A protein has these predicted regions:
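Hydrophobic alpha-helical segments at protein termini of multi-pass membrane proteins
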Residues: 1-244
Length: 244
């Protein structure tokens, strides 16, 4: 196995192991997690097919950074992730705890990130592998945590199910758009206005830290039965405590 392939997949494997360990209650079946990973591969293939079809009919979104960020990445990628996720896990009987939505979503997103990483690193080399391991793959992980969080809210909360379902798409799309916009805009202006590009990159780094903070709060501070807020160290709210 080549070094580049190992570097491409190492952050994906590391984050998959991390989220699997964080599932401290009822571990999800490995077969279902494999389906989620393969679903992410399916998302990557679908995105490639979609944009190849658009190019064939003369439609291009590679015009300005915000259009490329939204229409070329955030919207199609996160929407397809959501649709594949619903298809694979929504009616599955193993989807029975709040944290499950986060586990499924992250595995699917990491499947996508793995394919994307291999393609980028194959063309860009070790420098790209290191950069994407620090930023791009964790970003897909963060988007997935937020998507899984709202997906579980839609499944387990008794009210506002459609609203939480909408948020499961809208919030990851927004976060993904902002992430790509700061990065693409800074690259676009790097030779035109270096000081502006530097400020954008600084904003990008701060946004990356914010994503991590948002994701970790979603992972640690929700009841496993219904998704209600709980105190640190607890696993269930008073309404969902298992019978002794």
């Amino acid at each position: 196995m080549s070094l580049l392939l190992v570097l491409s997949l190492a952050p994906v494997v590391a984050l998959a192991i991390y989220i699997y360990i964080k599932d401290k209650f009822e571990k999800e079946p490995l077969g279902l997690l494999l389906k989620c990973l393969l679903g992410g591969v399916g998302v990557a293939a679908s995105v490639l097919i979609l944009f190849n079809c658009l190019r064939l009919i003369g439609i291009s979104i590679d015009l300005i950074p915000w259009m490329q960020s939204f229409f070329g990445a955030a919207l199609p990628e996160e929407l397809l992730k959501f649709l594949f996720l619903i298809w694979i896990v929504w009616k599955n009987r193993n989807f029975n705890e709040f944290f499950d939505g986060i586990v499924y979503s992250t595995f699917l997103s990491l499947g996508f990130a793995g394919v994307e990483n291999v393609l980028y690193v194959a063309n860009g080399g070790i420098g790209v592998a290191i950069s994407r391991a620090i930023f791009a793959v964790p970003a897909h992980f963060f988007f997935a945590v937020v998507m899984g969080y709202y997906l579980s809210m839609a499944k387990f909360r008794k009210q506002n199910k459609l609203w939480f379902g909408f948020l499961a798409i809208a919030v990851p799309v927004l976060l993904h758009f902002l992430y790509d916009f700061f990065l693409m805009e800074s690259n676009y202006y790097s030779s035109i206005d270096p000081s502006y590009a530097t400020s954008l990159m600084f904003t990008f780094y701060l946004f990356d830290i914010l994503l991590w903070h948002i994701a970790m709060k979603r992972i640690h501070k929700r009841c496993q039965g219904c998704g209600a807020p709980i105190a640190k160290g607890q696993h269930y709210c008073s309404n969902c405590l298992p019978n002794p």
